């Protein structure tokens, strides 16, 4: 798809040639799904594996939690903003399979079973995601899918599941890991139901082998590369740095139907300052990441909600070109505490983020110029600059010789759209 668009003349040739990290070929899992990064809600980071509904009725992993989240997604504008997948993570299962080896939800916490929950979710226009594992057990120790890939794929399809997050704990050997992912992907396709497959294959395979992203993208709609996100700036920073260091292999793998997954958005929780929440949102959009929030939609500040629901920012993430953004080398090496990323958009536009990585002092000024962009060739004579974050502001046309002073808070980000 990338290649077709590039060759269709939608891009100036200088721009194409200047971009060493632009993918020349993307072959995503051929199920026609996730043509833009999946958006939704996933329980893990915020709710973990709380199974005691007596003591923790408000936050235990139960059908009630998901029904409440489904209602919030519809009535609080999340679905309208694009967040469609309501996803269950680990700890939904009963400790054993049933007499026919079929998976079953914990009967106390999910008395209606997953089918009933799927109906509830679908009735509201949402889609349901579920979690399983390629190995003998899930990471939290519940029954895994090993030896039951076909049966489990069929069970999920029968229940009306729309997305499977497929983890890699207890995988056995590398061959078993890779084979398990292939088999589950094929089995899901064979059910005939549209089920997005979200993998963790590269995360588990990386210590043992060089990850073949072409192959991963043939079997998965998205895949995790790094450790779990936590509710902290150090975690968000680490994910950004990892992604930037490996961008030459990660960026070409991404495209419609196939996404690198830097893990959940933790905006609206406890650990990130306002500026750090802006940074996570801006950079997850630049990275064309799945936007899967893990927060409590029943209790979220108006600011975090507005940030997560910002339609123009989401549009950067959901741009149909499906290009993953990348960190651009600075031409202002004397000041390496600013970090710039750019993401090509359709219609010959760019999204650009400017992060102040200094963790001391106050707002710092950067004299932004379009010549800082990759090879500086996207704007022929002048570009129209719109700031989308932290607040919306139109700066109008900027000549390529002109400089725009911008002030960025410590650990904060300015997100620009350049047309
Ligand atoms: C792994 C995954 C997490 C989460 C937990 C659940 O750590 O990477 O995202 O799914 O397992 O146990």
What do these predicted regions represent?
Residues 2-3, 13-32:
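N-terminal signal peptide
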């Amino acid at each position: 798809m990338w290649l077709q668009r590039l060759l269709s003349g939608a891009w100036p040739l200088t721009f194409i040639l200047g971009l060493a990290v632009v993918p020349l070929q993307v072959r995503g899992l051929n199920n026609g799904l996730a043509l833009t990064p999946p958006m939704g809600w996933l329980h893990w980071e915020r709710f973990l594996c709380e199974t005691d509904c007596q003591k923790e009725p408000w936050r235990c992993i139960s059908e009630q939690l998901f029904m409440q989240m489904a209602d919030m997604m519809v009535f609080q504008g999340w679905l309208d903003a694009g967040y469609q997948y309501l996803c269950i993570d680990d700890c939904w299962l009963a400790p054993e399979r049933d007499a026919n080896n079929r998976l079953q939800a914990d009967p106390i916490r999910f008395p209606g079973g997953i089918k009933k929950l799927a109906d509830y979710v679908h009735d509201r226009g949402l889609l349901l995601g579920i979690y399983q594992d390629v190995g003998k057990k899930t990471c939290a120790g519940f029954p895994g899918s090993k030896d039951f890939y076909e049966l489990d794929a069929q069970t999920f399809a029968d229940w009306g599941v729309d997305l499977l997050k497929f983890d890699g704990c207890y995988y056995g050997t590398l061959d078993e890991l890779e084979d398990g992912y292939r088999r589950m992907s094929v089995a899901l396709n064979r059910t005939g139901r549209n089920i997005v497959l979200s993998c963790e294959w590269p995360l588990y395979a990386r210590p043992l082998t060089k990850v073949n992203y072409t192959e991963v993208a043939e079997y998965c709609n998205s895949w995790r590369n790094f450790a779990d996100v936590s509710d902290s700036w150090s975690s968000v920073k680490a994910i950004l740095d990892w992604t930037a260091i490996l961008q030459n292999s990660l960026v070409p793998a991404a495209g419609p139907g196939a996404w690198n997954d830097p893990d959940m958005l933790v905006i609206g929780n406890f650990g990130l300052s306002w500026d750090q929440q802006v940074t996570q949102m801006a950079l997850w959009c630049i990275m064309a990441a799945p936007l899967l929030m893990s927060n409590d939609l029943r209790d979220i500040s108006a600011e975090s909600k507005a940030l997560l629901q910002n339609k123009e920012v989401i549009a950067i993430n959901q741009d149909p070109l499906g290009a993953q953004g990348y960190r651009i080398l600075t031409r202002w090496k004397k000041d390496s505490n600013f970090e710039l990323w750019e993401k090509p958009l359709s219609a010959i536009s760019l999204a650009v983020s400017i992060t102040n990585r200094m963790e001391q002092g106050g707002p710092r000024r950067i004299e932004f110029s379009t010549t800082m962009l990759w090879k500086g060739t996207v704007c022929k004579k002048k570009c129209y600059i719109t700031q989308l974050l932290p607040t919306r502001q139109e700066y109008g046309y900027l000549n390529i010789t002109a400089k725009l002073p911008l002030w960025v808070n410590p650990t904060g980000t300015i997100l620009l759209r350049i047309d």
